[in-house]
Amino acid sequence: MPKRTGDILMSSPLSKFRRKLNFDSPYTSRAAAPTVQGIKRRSWTYRPMYRKPRMYRMYRSPDVPFGCEGPCKVQSYEQRDDVKHTGVVRCVSDVTRGSGITHRVGKRFCIKSIYILGKIWMDENIKKQNHTNQVMFFLVRDRRPYGTSPMDFGQVFNMFDNEPSTATVKNDLRDRYQVMRKFHATVVGGPSGMKEQCLLKRFFKVNTHVVYNHQEQAKYENHTENALLLYMACTHASNPVYATLKIRIYFYDAVTN
């Protein structure tokens, strides 16, 4: 008689009970009776890839973007910006052409994800004033880059009463600029309830396929398709804030380079 495995449910038409032969805690799944389908679905989770069925080995999650090849490369940008009411912009897809782990091999690569880490803070004079200031962040994809530098915040976004919190992409630029992610952070000044700095820690999946020209330098003017831009603006008209950020992009080189 063949032996039964430990995680098989034994039940028969004549029996009025079901048993589960494993040594799990009785409090994990006490509410509902487990099914064979649920156990089979979880049984391959913590096994190595060569011991999983063929379906799990063939149809995997898209770790590497379509049309790209490994290894995963990393490029970091350390910057300190004076964020004003009129806004500031930084290009976060500047990658130099080369053979290193931080370089692109050819013209094409795909930015799979971006990691924004840092803080926004006020100086000694501004944090003593009673006010609340919010910094708006817009992660924008420029599908057709043009010129030597990115367009300013006021040129890209349409605002009511010059308020960055009401910023939307202008109608004639909606096919070129796409807001992929939008978030904000708040600082408060004053003698009571002061919050002079706010930490930032954001991770986004973007899957942006960037195309350069034949130049090697990491510049905005060398982009031909899909430049990734980070726009920042504060809501207070007279009190600026400072942003100390470390931005990391994780990208893969394209196969067709």
From Swiss-Prot:
Key word Zinc-finger present: yes
GO cellular component: host cell; host cell nucleus; T=1 icosahedral viral capsid
Disulfide-linked positions: none
Motif (Nuclear export signal): 101-122
Motif Nuclear localization signal: positions: 40-54
Signal peptide span: none
Family: Belongs to the geminiviridae capsid protein family.
Name of this protein: Capsid protein
Organism name: Tomato yellow leaf curl Sardinia virus (isolate Spain-2) (TYLCSV)
